[in-house]
Amino acid sequence: MRRNYILYIIRYTFTIAFAMTLTACNEWLELMPDDSTIEEEFWQNGNQVESVVRACYRYMQEDNVMQRIILWGELRSDEVQNGSAISVSETDIVNANVKSNNTYCNWASFYTVINYCNNVLEKAPGVRQLDANFDEATFKAYMAEAYTLRALCYFYLLRTFRDVPLVLESSKSDDYDYNVSNRDTAAWVAYYQLPVSAASFTSQQYPLVDQEHYVVDKMIDDLKTAVEYAAKEWNDEENYGRITRRAAEALLADFYLWRASINQQLAPQQSTTDYRNCMAMCDAVLAETSEMEDAELVTGANLLRQVFYDGNSTESIFELNFTTSGHQNGGTSTLYGNTQKSRNPHLLAAVSLQMLFNQNKAGNDDADYDYRSKDFFNPRDNHIFKYEGQTPPSDFGSRNATYTYRGSSSQANWIFYRLADIYLMKAEALAQIASTAAEIEDVVTLCNKTYIRACTSSDEVKDQLDPNVYASTSDVQTLVLTERQRELMFEGKRWFDLLRLARRNGDVTTSWQYIESRYDDDVTTIRNKMSSIAAWYLPIYNNEMKINGNLRQNEYYESQDD
């Protein structure tokens, strides 16, 4: 029986990771010759379940995962330009010359994390029956971590490749067939309980049933369970580095926002419901945050230092903790560069970013008092400072002063969700359904949460986005997209924001207007290549296509490798 290449890698790395994880816990798992022996002797108590949960986080810290998280969300966006160390593979993606043999089309590392999660979800219930000390609350918390991390991995895969195989079982043995389809009609019929057979299914009859919706809907179901099961908080050291209820709610809000956008053209009423679902999840996060001691937005003056240099700040919800694990964050240091680590950047901040801080319709020059305009990147040489930076110039008048990077042994956490993102997700959802002047003003108020805190003075009349000049739904929709870029630049979100906009509109015209500034040459050629929404996704890796006959290539790339 043919075996999928990616899942051969999964099984191998899973066994090795077990050994590494347990060694750290002063235990040792002897590498047995077959999977059944390992399963029989390993899954005996709650501590062993936790060790595999921790392996999920640990593998997400690998460069193969981290660099894709950043590149998939930033490389083609309008907020970066090519740096001196950019690779040929990265340049090909930027220039819309991507082929299916491009290394960044390899999704294996994400399915490795998914496999760890699948093992937890399969085996933890049995361990609960074996170990009397493995209490129900702890068991559910571990399950919530696995559900949420698996959903997070699928969220990146969905937004990068669109149609991806949904693997919900762990690799068990050489005899297990993992040639899973990414157009699994039989699975759709079963999941949605459709009154048709797989053979008679047609997309014309069920326009909201396809692989993308199937994976999105399943992950939303899982995240609802995760919200119910998740720990409200861990101890202080782990409260931001492990999945909590707030983290599950934040990811669920993001999924609702995505589903609302992909449904907007075909099912506007369902789309409206999901925008409201997104807002409800954001409200849940904010309500729980209000009950926590010292959980709040960091001041603008401390934003770079506390949120991105120190990490685990008062506005954090979930971040991968490199600072406590001792593992190197090869994503930010390699791609954004760091002089203290002798790393030249693959990516620089786009020159056009300075214009973001000159768009306050009240007539103020935002760049003169918005901390983000000098702390997130160096406006002199366009080096990205967020994450790898330690100390920016102390005031706006000294922008030619030295930017000090974190030292060679200092590692940046990677932030998936923080309070700023919650306010802006809620703002985006509300902007899509706002029908009254009061609701439109509420969108501006939400954007002002991040805008006002980033300004230097306490004069909120001056340092605010004026609701009087954002009078229409179109105005506030554009405002949200702009404020998300000002606040969340270089956090792996911008490309997905623009793709979400394209899916919402049903075409790429408006989204292309943002990224057109990314190109100096061959603009017409690249625009033509990017004219289809399918071209905004990446092709499935060629090795996967060769080994798994059940995979179908993204339609845009079916003839690209000929």
What do these predicted regions represent?
Residues 40, 66-87, 167-170, 176-177, ...:
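Short, surface-exposed recognition loops and adjoining beta-strand edges that mediate ligand/DNA contacts
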Residues 46, 50-54, 58-60, 86-162, ...:
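Conserved, well-structured interaction surfaces
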Residues 44-47, 53, 57, 64, ...:
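Elongated scaffold/linker segments in the mid-to-C-terminal portions of large proteins
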